[in-house]
């Protein structure tokens, strides 16, 4: 509220009075307001109270079975059980004919209108069985459709919007990769810059101020980038990163794309848990929504590799939904008592899940083929505390890390369970071999990390004490037990990052910011050991040629930025960026070349070397020429600025002499200066001697 000008400040200048006087909000004379209330206050008018007629909480359920009086009680039981999940049902009416048979629809009244809306959203188009699919509508919808005008008016033709090419980023003749860099410029305001990793210096493609509130995320194939905002999320794409689609879901904290980029899942909080919405990316429409209990494993959806199925884990069950209808597979969940975790194969419609020990029944790892729900492999496990499922990227192997115990200690109420004498097993499933054989490796030390080679048959583990751990590399071959091929001892690392193309690996300590680059085909020699103090992330580019380490402001506030290295660990670029948040390489879609064509190119790769080397020389020559021209331009600009300032300095000579007693201090020699020494008392101290 503006403060009135007081008498004590009557002598203030005009600038101060501008701030103290109350502003005038009156419209100027002859002002015409051409903005409607709907345009100006649309969000508020949508919430204004309206006259109610008492039927807002009533829904109409159509396409129900028509049953005789003897079967009516059973139908009521089924319907009540299904619809009571949406809220408290106050009254239900089943209209009947003269013989007492139901007419195939019912009126259902909920306690509140919001519960009725929730029932329509969740149960409309719900399949009761193969013959009956519910049509659920609000009773007020009938009144709305009664007011449809009799004269039909054709819809207004919308102008065609030319959409940018979403795949232009893979048309670059030199196949340079792209990346984005995010930095926070103000609270809830993040600037995002998009770059192309050209040589010798990266090329800036686009920079967006206030592009997102928190962070960004690429889609799996690199087609879209998603941004987070208070009303929801938006996806962007094309050559200039224009908005493609927006999805209204207030407070969205996390999103997940389906592998083929057909669907988007948004996770947002609610007062009682979490709301999860699955969207169609191309249309922007909502396919289905769920209510979860928070960011727990029971809330997370997992997609099959081909987008045909999406699954989530429930209490003693797995719910698998088919796309695009998002109905349950075979209209029912898969009952699996004691299930603790599951994961899809990255290349096949196979689900791996594990079940905990129950009543002297051993734990079990199972592979199930979808959609037939046929179990193709089982493995029983004893004394199991926990399991982790690790698929190799190519889908050739599945490793189950089993945390086992020697002794189990429970308190009297069996609420607190302690596992003693822990040791670990790796169960390796050979997915491409007949009957899926399983190999087992036992490790008696603490396992700190596990990582598969994405393309290849090796995996690596960190085991032992954290400050002096060992890194072991195992090789998996057909018909032979996995063998230890190399052990690097006394390594201070916490994470393992394989190159997307295999062969090279970075052993990282994300606590201390130390890194070691290893070539697994060259006797596991450490090619470089750079440091990046406080680094909290490591990102390989899609081709496996470059590695980026970053210090994010989410972790620290000083010395934030990122470093770029070659795959051998040679530093290429150091960038210090205030409030740096994220560095993300843009993913690439899989190649369209057949395996035969790829093998042919690899076989004849040497004949392409001269062409590549010539292009590199021309590029460096061009870059050197551009660099020399840039330096010459900078020197010319500097000399022009210098000459201008010298001319100003000479023009001010008479003024300087006048201010300095008509002494030309510009040409004053050292021997013309009179030096005078002045002494004065600073302080006086008196010390008494005994």
Swiss-Prot record:
InterPro entries per the UniProt record, alphabetical: EIF3B, eIF3B_RRM, Nucleotide-bd_a/b_plait_sf, RBD_domain_sf, RRM_dom, TIF_beta_prop-like, WD40/YVTN_repeat-like_dom_sf
Annotated GO MF terms: RNA binding; translation initiation factor activity; translation initiation factor binding
A Pfam family per the record: eIF2A
Stretches assigned to the RRM domain: 57-141
Residue spans of the WD repeats: 207-246, 292-331, 334-369, 442-484, 530-575
Complex and partners: Component of the eukaryotic translation initiation factor 3 (eIF-3) complex. The eIF-3 complex interacts with pix. Interacts with mxt.
Function: RNA-binding component of the eukaryotic translation initiation factor 3 (eIF-3) complex, which is involved in protein synthesis of a specialized repertoire of mRNAs and, together with other initiation factors, stimulates binding of mRNA and methionyl-tRNAi to the 40S ribosome. The eIF-3 complex specifically targets and initiates translation of a subset of mRNAs involved in cell proliferation.
Name of the protein described by the UniProt record: Eukaryotic translation initiation factor 3 subunit B
Gene: eIF3b
